[in-house]
Every structure is written in C-alpha cells, then in structure tokens.
A protein has these predicted regions:
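Periplasmic-binding protein-like
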Residues: 118-124, 218-253
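Cleavable N-terminal signal peptides
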Residues: 10-12, 22
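Short coil/turn segments
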Residues: 40, 94, 128-133, 154-159, ...
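Bacterial N-terminal signal peptides that target proteins for export
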Residues: 1-9
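Hinge/capping helix and adjacent helix->loop/strand transition within the periplasmic-binding protein
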Residues: 54, 78-87, 100-185, 244-279
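N-terminal signal peptide c-region/cleavage motif recognized by signal peptidases
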Residues: 17-21
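N-terminal (or domain-start) structured segment
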Residues: 23-111, 148-149, 161, 170-201, ...
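An extracytoplasmic/periplasmic, membrane-proximal ligand-sensing/linker region
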Residues: 28-30, 171, 257-322
C-alpha cells in the first residue's frame, strides 16, 4: 500500500511539474488573435497592429482571425468556449459589455478572463460635411419632428456604436431608422447619402473630417478629445451618457495565471513599443495600457455605467438572472 501511495503521489507530482513546465515554456505555437469585427474596420486595423507587435515580443506568430457577428457575440462565445491555454485570445472592446447586456449572448462579461487594455477612444456621431445639421440638437430636433425618417448607421447590434447611437437618439426623444452596416460601408453610405448619419469608430472617419468631407456633431466620452477640441460631448449637450470605446485582450476563463501574466506583459510592451505607440499617435487614438487588476476595476465601473445607459434608453436585455 505504501508503494502504491508513493507511486500515486509521484505521478501526481510529475503531472504538476509537467504542467508548470508547459506554462513556463508558453507559447510554443502560434496564438489565434480573434477580432470581433470585419476586415477594414477600426477594430481590425488596431488589432492587426497590436498582434504584429506582440508576435515580435512572444517569439511566436499572433495570427489575426476575423469572426464578426452579433456585435462581438461570435468572437466572445468562441473564445469563452476555447481551451483555457492562452492560444486563443479575443481582441476585446466595449462590445464585451454592450453585447452581453443587450442579450446577444447568454453570459456576462465575467465569463471570460480579461488581460488588460491597450487604448481607448470616443464614439462620434458623424454626418456629411455639407449636411444641413451643424449641431446634434438640429439633427435630433428634425428627427423628433419627422420620426422614422432619418437613418443612422452603426457597426452591429450590441456593438458600442449601436449602444451609443441608440442612447443618443432615444435620450434625445428621436426615433431614427437604425442600420447595422460594416465599417467601410458606413463611410461610403454617409458620403453617398444612403444614410443621414453614423455612429462610428473615432479615428476612421476623423480622416474624412480632416479632409473636409464629414463632420462630428458630438462624441460619447466624458470629456472633449484633443484631436477634435471643438466637438462637444453628449453629456455637455444634456444627454445622460458617458463612455469610451476601449480595446484590450481577453481569454477563456481558467487560463493559468502564469500565462495571463505573460500575455499582459507582452501586451503592455507591444502597446508601448515605438512602432505601435507611434501609429496610435498618428491615428489620434489615446494609448492607455493597463494590466489585469486595473482593467478589472475599469470593466466593473464601465459595466455599471453601460447598464444604466441601456436601461435609461430602454435597450437593456441581459439574459442573466440578477
């Protein structure tokens, strides 16, 4: 019996040592970097940049894979159900909070482990430069006077742009036609007049603003952005809403802490690298890297804020029992 117990203990110890060695050697193969939105949009552009920077640091390819759909639901479900070994990573955004609270998935944001944040940006309400509205109030006043006539494009149901758009319109008493449209097509539709406005990723339409083809009527964040200092926030205009669109990393629940720590370190080093930071500056994005602990606190606060916004706007649909 003593010999048998010794064998069992020895086998268990060997297994634990093997697991520890595996974590110490991680990564030993390419990492899937899952992007929740389609090619060519803001999430895709930013995601591919950070994936490339992380590849150099980790010594293994970090391979971008687009899995769009459901305002991030497809990606978050895929990563949630993946093996918790750090080889499948979600390029998260504020959509991890919006898509869970709008009911696109049957779980909460806490169903995944979150590595940290890379950057953040406001969400602008965009119209064509020669549009007849020069303020958000002018747009919303016409929308209230002519319900279900003005069109507003956004990324997808449950996305941050969807929630921002619905919040801005509903809190203004406006009934708009909301159009889920892929990133590049949103800009085309604004310029062609197929949509009257769009709620978009900040840096992509910003270049059209600089080129004199579009204008921002408002942004969603709590304070004005240095890149567009004359554009007011929604809160300044009397709307009870305030949030930024952030980007970061998430993995399957139960991923070993040692692996999460390595991912966090690589993410922060990549975010602060000269190449990535320089690119973010050119794109007019706010580089704001933070690790697991700080990001956990931010997510909790942001989630409470978004739930309040969604309830106020009448679009809270979480499938989780409270």
């Amino acid at each position: 019996m003593k010999i048998l117990n010794a064998l069992i203990i020895g086998t268990a110890a060997a297994a634990l040592l093997a697991a520890a060695d595996a974590r110490a050697e991680w990564p030993e193969k390419p990492i899937q970097f899952i992007i929740p939105f389609g090619a060519g949009g803001g999430a895709d552009i930013e995601g591919r940049l950070i994936a490339k920077a992380m590849s150099a640091i980790l010594g293994q390819p970090v391979v971008p894979i687009n899995k769009p759909g459901g305002g991030g639901a497809i990606t978050y479900t895929f990563v949630k159900n993946s093996k918790p070994d750090g080889y499948t990573v979600a390029w998260n955004s504020t959509s991890i909070l919006t898509t869970t609270n709008i009911g696109n998935v049957p779980f909460e944001y806490t169903a995944l482990d979150h590595i940290g944040q890379v950057a953040q940006q406001p969400v602008p309400f965009v119209v064509r430069k020669d549009a007849r509205w020069n303020t958000l109030k002018e747009f919303m006043d016409e929308c209230k006077a002519k319900p279900n006539t003005l069109k507003v494009a956004f990324a997808g149901f449950g996305s941050a742009t969807h929630v921002a758009g619905v919040a801005m319109t509903q809190l203004s008493g406006c009934k708009a036609i909301m159009l889920p449209v892929k990133g590049p097509d949103r800009r085309k539709m604004i310029l062609s007049g197929e949509t009257d406005a769009a709620v978009d990723i900040f840096f992509v339409p910003l270049k059209f603003v600089k080129a004199g083809k579009m204008k921002f009527l408002a942004i969603s964040s709590g304070k004005r952005d240095p890149a567009t200092p004359d554009v007011p926030t929604a809160k300044e205009l009397g709307l009870d809403m305030e949030f930024d669109l952030f980007r970061g990393l998430s993995v399957a629940k139960g991923t070993p802490q040692a692996i999460k720590d390595k991912l966090e370190s690589a993410m922060i080093k990549a975010a602060n690298s000269k190449a990535f930071a320089g690119r973010m500056k050119k794109l007019k994005l706010t580089l704001a890297p933070m690790g697991q602990a700080a990001f956990k606190a931010k997510l909790a606060k942001a989630n409470a804020n978004i739930v309040a916004i969604m309830k106020n706007a009448g679009i809270y649909r979480s499938k989780m029992k409270k």
